[in-house]
Amino acid sequence: MLVRGYVVSRKLFASILIGALLGIGAPPSAHAGADDVVDSSKSFVMENFSSYHGTKPGYVDSIQKGIQKPKSGTQGNYDDDWKGFYSTDNKYDAAGYSVDNENPLSGKAGGVVKVTYPGLTKVLALKVDNAETIKKELGLSLTEPLMEQVGTEEFIKRFGDGASRVVLSLPFAEGSSSVEYINNWEQAKALSVELEINFETRGKRGQDAMYEYMAQACAGNRVRRSVGSSLSCINLDWDVIRDKTKTKIESLKEHGPIKNKMSESPNKTVSEEKAKQYLEEFHQTALEHPELSELKTVTGTNPVFAGANYAAWAVNVAQVIDSETADNLEKTTAALSILPGIGSVMGIADGAVHHNTEEIVAQSIALSSLMVAQAIPLVGELVDIGFAAYNFVESIINLFQVVHNSYNRPAYSPGHKTQPFLHDGYAVSWNTVEDSIIRTGFQGESGHDIKITAENTPLPIAGVLLPTIPGKLDVNKSKTHISVNGRKIRMRCRAIDGDVTFCRPKSPVYVGNGVHANLHVAFHRSSSEKIHSNEISSDSIGVLGYQKTVDHTKVNSKLSLFFEIKS
């Protein structure tokens, strides 16, 4: 479930209410359905209960003065039932929320704080995150927001087991051992705040520090990535890679054969075919430079590193960068999403030389940055080659940090319960038959899970197309998210037609080679009016993958999962 509001950053599923199945002083009917929504084995009472919260840039100092409910914004969640202060039991997961999602390429990050309640706190672990179901089974008001009721004296008396407050908990994300906590805003004011780590002091290198910190969370994990090889989380020194990359770019630019090749550039808009031809020749010339010797070795053994792939990728990235409508995130995402297997092209994924990963990464980024800088004038305006290359280095390093972190999360079994749909290298399916049914005739929420993986090469997930009926069946933007090997990633949703909403991940998402994704789609019904099949524009949800060319037109690979409308 999506969180966010003021300093929260990662989305934390919100819900956990109920634990005290014993119902001290409460009538039997109050807990009649508690077993269906409360996990008593994971509920507990603790003195001086602590958890961790990730805060965005600009809020590290203010949050240490105390927790306050923001006067505007989402106040922790888009859904009124789940507005609250979010935290987690894992400080490394909390760190992942310290990046400003609206400006992810700034390089900045906030920090992590440890928050602690005085006295006794009851943690109620929930089995489900559907607020309507929880309120119904717990005998709560169906019209009052869930988290507001959690903070009432009546609720605390019924479910607190003598504690001063009740905090709800849910799994942090599918496949994760971490949990998230949802705190009532008024109760959260009692939290004492202690700084755990501050990334703001690193300025534009704050995200580097954040990823270095997060790498500690998986230092002991051995993740099976391909036959015959396994890796723990690789803690690459991105400062060193950045410096190495820029040094290599300077050396490459001044090398005679490369300099001559650069002078042969058309330096004006040309056809896509001619641009690719020139870039492929540039790639071949550059690989003869000693600074790219490791990369040349890899290129000779893995066809995905071939010059034609680099050239096609560079042209596509340049086209996106040249677009006046593409925002920063779209521009950088293009670097990894345009070409299938681009992770391998850049020297990160399986198949690359692992004994010298740092050097391979630096060489890959140096060559890629130069090629993109060369490609931009071929598809759009003239730019300074050095400036464009260095700018792209920063973008690609930030993006790789995100992707690399996702790759190195522990894998989990996708657990398909329906027949997967195979297309363009992807495998997509509903998690259960029930997920494929959209029920109407009631007011409230529903969640639907989709499993996504790839057969071999890592492939990108560009987004999802969701049919809607404005005012009757809308997308709950705060709860729609995608989880990659246990790590939740927010999605940015917008209406592209009156009856279609497009949601795309706010960070690059890849599946394949042991990496699986769970797409959680949430719908909201503001009316109890029944919906008929002929009212909705489409009877399928479209999962979008990599770009390909069909009849000279670029389109995304699309996998359609059909659903039923039932009342």
Swiss-Prot record:
Top-level taxon of the source organism: Viruses
Activity regulation field: Partially inhibited by 1,8-naphthalimide (NAP).
Binding-site residues for NAD(+), renumbered to this chain: 53, 97
PTM section of the record: Proteolytic activation by host furin cleaves the protein in two parts, Diphtheria toxin fragment A and Diphtheria toxin fragment B; which remain associated via a disulfide bond.
InterPro entries: Diphtheria_tox_rcpt-bd_dom_sf, Diphtheria_tox_transloc_sf, Diphtheria_toxin, Diphtheria_toxin_catalytic_dom, Diphtheria_toxin_rcpt-bd_dom
Protein task: Diphtheria toxin, produced by a phage infecting Corynebacterium diphtheriae, is a proenzyme that, after activation, catalyzes the covalent attachment of the ADP ribose moiety of NAD to eukaryotic elongation factor 2 (eEF-2). Fragment A is the catalytic portion responsible for enzymatic ADP-ribosylation of elongation factor 2, while fragment B is responsible for binding of toxin to cell receptors and entry of fragment A.
Protein name: Diphtheria toxin
Organism encoding this protein: Corynephage beta
Lineage start: Viruses, Duplodnaviria, Heunggongvirae, Uroviricota, Caudoviricetes
